[in-house]
Amino acid sequence: MRLKAQILGIKAEDFETEQISADDAQYTGRTELYIPEEMVKEFKKKGISTENLYQSDEEGNQFLPELHENEFVILTPDQSAKKTLLGRVSGNKVVPLAFKKSKPYGVSPRNVGQYFMQEALMTSAEEAPLVILKGMAGTAKTFYSLAVGMEKVYNNPTGEYRRVIVCRPNAQFDDDIGFLPGDEKEKIAPLMRPVIDNLEQILDSDEKRRYEDEEELGDKITEIFERGIIQTEAMNFIRGRSIARTYLIIDEAQNMTPNQVKGIITRAGQGTKIILLGDPQQIDKPFLDERTNGLSYAAKHMIDSSLCWQITLSAEECERSALAMDAIKRL
């Protein structure tokens, strides 16, 4: 439609119903609150009511901001600000993290955002069937999602998931991959190289499973794919299916349209967990922007859903090299 309008010299605009507001775009899934010092022990045992928590304005007035279901919280004791506590909004309470001490496939959180991300990913599909992770490149979204997937499927083959499926929208080519040579796996191989890179890092980072050389590591990755523990599929082949008991990672979801995201989420089968990953500020798809892409659209409409957990990783939580961070800021 845009192309037709451009040819005819007519201005084309997005549907207002598919745009998110500037305020919605700023929702990060996390907030900071103060907790009375005397209630710290109670929080650690069973959580506390949100009525006991507060923020302070510049004049020192205390107030409780609007909180959303499953919003993550950094709690600071009001008498000892040096040590913070991590929790999550559940109904009218803030409860402590259940998986704070977990190390999925030997991976440990390195910052607050990764603790929150781990909590959302490790929680069962019954309680958290949809997880939305936003953040710039280098915040370990794909890495951590794969690590938890490996923990849930490879280390626990009789557990809740039968497999890990990874998809990426085809932003580099045309929407239809049919014109590319080879079978489905050969067609999507260029899109999935980042998945292999992250998997190599995960496998090689576990001290209990260190591999002696590149060949041994490559053989292990081949085994994982041949056994169907991790599968990669084109987005075109996912839509229309009902996938059960699957840990489904949708990488680079900011390059999907709202309709594509809706088509994926509404077809989730029993026991399936869907993880949407991406950076709304890094869009490669023509005609999509920060406010009209599928990732932002889903994040907006799933706020306050008890079945959706979402978190935005900050730039300070990027785990890439100092050069990469400096380039991101300068370029």
Predicted regions and their residues:
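Interdomain "pre-motor" coupling segment immediately N-terminal to P-loop NTPase/helicase cores
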Residues: E13-K100
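Conserved helicase motor core of SF1/SF2 NTP-dependent helicases
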Residues: M1-K45, K101-Q118, M122, A128-L130, ...
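Hydrophobic residues in beta-strands of the RecA-like P-loop NTPase core, especially within AAA+ ATPase
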Residues: I249-I250
